[in-house]
Design a protein with these regions (language model features):
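Surface-exposed helix-loop "recognition/capping" segments that flank conserved functional motifs
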Residues: 1-20, 193-198, 205-213, 217, ...
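Bulky hydrophobic/aromatic content
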Residues: 1-53
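Short beta-strand-initiation
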Residues: 33, 60-66, 142, 163
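Loop-centered beta-sheet repeat module
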Residues: 39-86, 90-92
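Well-ordered beta-strand positions
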Residues: 69-72, 169-170, 193
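Surface-exposed, charged, gly/pro-rich loop-and-adjacent secondary-structure segments at domain edges
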Residues: 80-187
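A common structural junction motif
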Residues: 164-169, 195-201
Length: 222
């Protein structure tokens, strides 16, 4: 039904809100000229010469980049791009607030063959890899996980699934075992850490090690 009555419409607007699921953060400052040049280059499919400071470095480095796409995640805006000095043509993420300067070049940007943004996102491209998971096949993509929660901690996952193939088992001690197929990423690790003592165990073992941020042995498992 259409809300034709303006009074009713305003009443509805006054009664509906969207609250973020995570802690609200203030967006970092972005150099506006750099941002405009990145967007311009992306629109016209041109390469850029950029001065960029990585999160693990204190000094900026210069790169020639092929802009591919823009993605906003929370308050952070990222540029997907490849570096011209990378023979493997790896698609990398560059946070816009870390660009000190950007120059638009006349050379055409190159996009990897068969790249589709939706497919990239569906495959967990923005989940950010975790160093431990490099030991797993395909760096932990599409991995079967088993998570054991206290009854209270796991309750939300009985309502909102981790994956379409998720199953829930209620154990005799009233703990919950969740089985699902997911991409193992740093985002998953941070999310699981948020459960604190409510997360009792996780498999594969490397996932639980990443959550605890320390090696584990069989004796440490619940």
């Amino acid at each position: 039904r259409q809300l034709k009555n303006s009074k009713v419409t305003h009443s509805w607007i006054d009664r509906v809100r969207i609250e973020p699921a995570s802690q609200p953060l203030i967006a970092p400052h972005i150099d506006l000229e750099s941002k405009d040049n990145i967007y311009h280059a992306l629109f016209y499919q041109l390469q850029i010469k950029a001065s960029y400071t990585r999160s693990d470095k204190s000094q900026a480095s210069e790169y020639i980049l092929n802009p591919i796409a823009i993605i906003q995640r929370g308050v952070i805006i990222y540029l997907l791009a490849t570096r011209t000095d990378d023979p493997d043509v790896i698609i990398r993420t560059f946070a816009l607030h870390r660009f000190a300067s950007v120059e638009i070049l006349e050379s055409a940007a190159q996009t990897p063959d068969n790249f589709h943004l939706d497919n990239y996102l569906d495959a967990g491209g923005m989940g950010f890899s975790h160093p431990l998971f490099s030991q797993l096949p395909d760096r932990g993509k599409h991995t079967a996980v088993e998570l054991q929660f206290t009854k209270q901690a796991g309750k939300s996952l009985t309502e909102s699934k981790l994956s379409d193939d998720q199953t829930v088992t209620i154990n005799s001690d009233e703990t919950l075992t969740i089985r699902a197929t997911v991409n193992l990423t740093s985002q998953l690790v941070w999310w699981l850490r948020g459960f604190g003592s409510g997360l009792l165990d996780a498999k594969p073992a490397l996932l639980y090690e990443a959550v605890l941020d320390k090696p584990i042995n069989d004796a440490q498992r619940q």
